[in-house]
């Protein structure tokens, strides 16, 4: 499954999640069989070219998320996690909060 995370850079180890309007890059995480398969970085979400993305993980619950839900994505929010590795570990153990209407 594919997961978007708005981040402050394009380094898989050092990039940190940021509010979507502060994102310098968008990390696209390919998560399958309980682990991260790959992480690719894009300048904008549109650069992916319309491929289906299952989840988006946002920095806080006050961000605009309705457009993502309209696109069919599940929207999750981090609690304390900042790095991609920590976020994906929390995702794996269902420790992220879900946003819903």
Predicted region positions:
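Non-catalytic interface/targeting segments
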Residues: 1-52, 79, 83-101
């Amino acid at each position: 499954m594919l997961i978007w995370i708005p981040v402050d850079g394009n380094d898989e180890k050092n990039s940190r999640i940021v509010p979507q309007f502060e994102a310098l890059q968008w990390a696209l995480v390919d998560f399958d069989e309980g682990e991260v398969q790959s992480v690719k970085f894009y300048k904008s979400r549109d650069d992916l070219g319309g491929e289906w993305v299952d989840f988006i993980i946002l920095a806080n619950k006050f961000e605009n998320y309705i457009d993502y839900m309209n696109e069919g994505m599940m929207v999750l929010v981090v609690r304390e996690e900042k790095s991609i590795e920590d976020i994906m570990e929390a995702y794996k153990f269902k420790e992220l909060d879900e946003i819903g209407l």
